């Protein structure tokens, strides 16, 4: 890892794998970067803006496995799933570094859940990279539904070699 890969909110110097003309990705394109597959691929689409902020969406259909028993008669997306959605979005902040590597989460701090997420909702995540040291990355993420905050937190992850294809 090169030393110029240090980032903070004011000076994001990490590059992404996206060209200046390709900042939007579909779920199928995301599979090139994330190791997750259905039913655990929890990002439907993303956009990385000019400030290196990830904007992602996940559409809650009501058919998800995690809604089956949480809660009968009143299905609600579990908080841990909201964390996973934010986590997958954070990994997309470092697309350029994901080649032959995967992210393993090392911490989720200061997470707060503010409102329920139910079938029919579209979860929108905004994630930023706040710091990086060696192979460790630190992010801030918030999830909203219809502009209302439903979850927020600080996430950290390590970037490791992808052993699946070796």
Regions found by a protein language model. Give the residues of each.
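Hydrophobic beta-strand-centered segment that forms part of the acyl-chain substrate-binding groove
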Residues: 89-124, 150-158
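Catalytic strand-loop segment that frames the active site of acyl-thioester-processing enzymes
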Residues: 38-77
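Short Pro/Gly-enriched beta-strand edge/turn motifs at strand-loop
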Residues: 24-30, 121-125
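Active-site helix/loop of acyl-thioester processing domains in fatty-acid/polyketide metabolism
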Residues: 46, 77-100
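Short aromatic-glycine motifs in intrinsically disordered, low-complexity regions
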Residues: 27-37, 99
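Cationic, low-complexity basic patches in intrinsically disordered or flexible, solvent-exposed regions
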Residues: 5
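HotDog/MaoC-like acyl-thioester-processing domains
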Residues: 51-55, 117-121, 128-166
